Amino acid sequence: MVKELVERIRQKDQRAMSQFYQQYVDELSSVCYRYVPFEDDAKDVLQNSFVKIFTSLPTFDYRSEEALRGWMRRVVASEALLYLRERKRLLFVEQTAEVKELADADEPQADLISPDTLHQMISELSVGYRTVINLYVFEGYSHKQIADLLGITESTSASQLYFAKRILARRIKELTNSKR
């Protein structure tokens, strides 16, 4: 079914494009909002992503729907990062010895809260923390790949992830303690 849809898009079938868009817009929107939480900006990024997907689809080597979905998620993530870089919203905090370290906590206990609550907590992180945690945890990038993609050092990527996890662990702990 999906393979036939891709073939029809390659032949510039407008109905196939519309059907494809409807089939994947929700999934790709959620990827987009992880990086760009502002609705108007996210809509722009998503639109640019679909343009890129539709123009690149003729050369995409379709092997499976899973591979297609992974590729589209990477396109959206790349477009979101490009958008943030162009607008200088992607700020990273270099951690130094002078930075007051957060209390060392275990890994965030994400299983204690709902996925929606976790998503909300991640969206409230600073852009740098949020971007690195999304790329590392949800997209599976290594610190080297993140560093290359964002133009930062591997240690900055690792530091951003460390502090993002500490903040999330603290917030989860506060939330679960307040419910007792």
Task: Identify the role of each PLM range.
Residues 1-27, 58, 123, 144-145, ...:
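N-terminal module of bacterial RNA polymerase sigma factors
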Residues 59, 73-94, 163:
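Arg/Lys-rich amphipathic alpha helix in sigma70-family domain 2
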Residues 44-51, 66-78:
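Structural recognition of an alpha-helix C-terminal capping motif at a helix-to-coil junction
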Residues 10-19, 30-48, 154, 176-180:
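Short, charged helix-capping/linker segments at alpha-helix termini
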Residues 123-131, 139-156:
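Helix-turn-helix DNA-binding module
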Residues 2, 82, 89-118:
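Internal acidic/polar
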